[in-house]
């Protein structure tokens, strides 16, 4: 009898994974920038409410959610949170990362962007609470902007740790406002994220050899790189357009393709300023297109 029980337990242990996959999240919402930074206020607090509810409704446990808001979301705090998320990640984990804040282009110091587009001299960056709007603003030189090269290294490291059974979804409601939309935009009446002006630094170069980092995760951004990321007014409240669409569209059993299709439908139903356009931007690695993002 004891031998039979032992054999049953052994069979169960072989059939079940050693550790259950965990749903983890890092969510960053910055709307109340210090006046000293030069950035205008955003409605990111409203985004926080609906994204936290979305995660709760999709079985993310509070202890597995790292949330930074407003002035606590400094450069160091965001980097420390990324370090923590990376250290916690295990094989098979499903990870959700969300940025709801300002975004800005910044001088590309290592030349990697030009490998894709020879005319591109800027990196993309998210703007923490302690980053200023322009070079020299209150003595600021750009040290607190977090560029896409840095984020990509974290995300590639995460996908390496979680492996083929895991999945990483990165949602960026922090796009810069593209230059082609500059004409006719009125910042007094239209609420948008980012700025038309790039953060231009003196070019110093980088000791790192430029290279293109592969994208091994699902990436969704609020707009194309030449468009403006407008906030949406819904029932008298402002929201980030992508944050609102995510909260309305996302459920854990979706594939990446199903999610982008649902987001596009929601986008079309949302109001936009007269004469303006905003199109969802996404990148899905071929092997992840039909994979359930947060399913089993």
Regions found by a protein language model. Give the residues of each.
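Cysteine endopeptidase catalytic domains of the caspase/legumain-like
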Residues: 16-296
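Bacterial N-terminal signal peptides
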Residues: 6-14
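Positively charged n-region of N-terminal signal peptides that target proteins for export
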Residues: 1-4
């Amino acid at each position: 009898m004891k031998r039979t029980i032992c054999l049953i337990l052994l069979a169960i242990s072989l059939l079940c994974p050693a550790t259950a996959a965990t749903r983890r999240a890092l969510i960053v919402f910055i709307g109340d920038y210090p006046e000293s930074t030069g950035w205008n206020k955003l409605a990111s607090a409203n985004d926080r409410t609906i994204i936290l509810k979305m995660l709760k409704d999709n079985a993310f446990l509070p202890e597995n959610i790292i949330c930074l808001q407003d002035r606590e979301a400094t450069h160091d705090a965001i980097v420390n949170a990324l370090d923590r998320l990376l250290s916690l990640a295990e094989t098979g984990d499903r990870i959700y990362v969300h940025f709801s804040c300002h975004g800005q282009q910044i001088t590309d110091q290592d030349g990697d962007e030009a490998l894709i587009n020879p005319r591109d001299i800027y990196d993309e960056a998210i703007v923490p609470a302690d980053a200023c709007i322009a070079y020299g603003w209150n003595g600021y030189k750009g040290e607190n902007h977090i560029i896409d090269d840095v984020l990509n290294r974290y995300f590639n490291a995460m996908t390496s740790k979680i492996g083929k059974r895991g999945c990483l979804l990165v949602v960026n409601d922090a796009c810069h406002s593209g230059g082609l939309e500059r004409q006719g935009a009125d910042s007094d009446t239209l609420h948008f994220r980012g700025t038309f002006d790039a953060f231009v630094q003196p070019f110093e170069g980088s000791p790192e050899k430029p290279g293109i980092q592969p994208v091994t995760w699902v990436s969704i951004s609020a707009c194309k790189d030449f468009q403006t990321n407008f906030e949406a007014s819904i029932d008298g409240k402002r929201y980030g357009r992508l944050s609102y669409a995510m909260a309305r569209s996302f459920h854990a059993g979706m594939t990446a393709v199903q999610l982008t299709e649902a987001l596009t439908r929601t986008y079309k139903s949302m109001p936009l300023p007269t004469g303006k356009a905003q199109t969802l931007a996404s990148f899905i690695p071929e092997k992840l297109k039909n994979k359930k993002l947060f399913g089993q």
